């Protein structure tokens, strides 16, 4: 039992089209400083769940609470002001701007903390520290993903939502991104990560949630889910349904 959850999702139902639910009665609890991984077959509703938490998809039923405050369907910028960060799966950096200019966009209403936050991001992503004046479009795929995460960190989030941060990256860059997220978590930031690489996700996370067809299928300590035959069977069943 988590004594003081920083993020609580209570039985939410959400979707993009009226009358069509992608997420159905999903619940999630995240403790301060906890790393939570969300896995599941393609189309399970994982990314939609994150977007619903961050106010990008309308929640039709249920609630989202941040430190006890109801924040259901608040606009994304208000959640950022409440120290929630979000890194989407689709790349959202500005290639014509420099690395530093991209980071400056993320500082939001905390301009006086620029030097402090820049030092924090540079410490988390040393590869970016020597490239602040470089155009973001010249970075590699892995470096651009690190920049996207770094920009989300500029607003000093206490909760960071990551939507498949390893998508489209080489195995080497995937591992670098996973390692960096673990270091970010060690700094005290709670992380909720949706990830297709189920094994690596559960190796990093403290607890895991398994979604299937928009619903909570299983939850528990990440290490136990990693070796749970029911979870393996769910993935194999998903593959069989596609054939």
Locations of regions flagged by a protein language model:
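Catalytic Walker B motif of ABC-type/P-loop ATPase nucleotide-binding domains
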Residues: 160-164
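Conserved ABC transporter NBD signature motif
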Residues: 62-71, 82, 114-123, 220
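The feature captures the beta-strand-to-loop junction immediately N-terminal to the Walker
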Residues: 39-41
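Conserved ABC ATPase signature
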Residues: 135-139, 143
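ABC ATPase signature
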Residues: 97, 139, 152-153
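Helix-to-loop junction immediately C-terminal to a conserved catalytic motif
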Residues: 54
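A short, proline-enriched helix->beta-strand linker immediately N-terminal to the Walker B motif
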Residues: 154-158
